[in-house]
Amino acid sequence: RHHRKRIGHTIKQLAKLVKHIHEY
């Protein structure tokens, strides 16, 4: 079972969200 890819995707999305929040 490989969940690393999914975790990486989640982290990427989280980073995007953090960036968006940082702009405010």
UniProtKB/Swiss-Prot annotation:
Compartment(s): Secreted
Tissue: Expressed by the skin glands.
Any single Gene Ontology cellular-component annotation: extracellular region
Keywords from the named record: Secreted
Domain of life: Eukaryota
Protein name: Skin secreted peptide 2
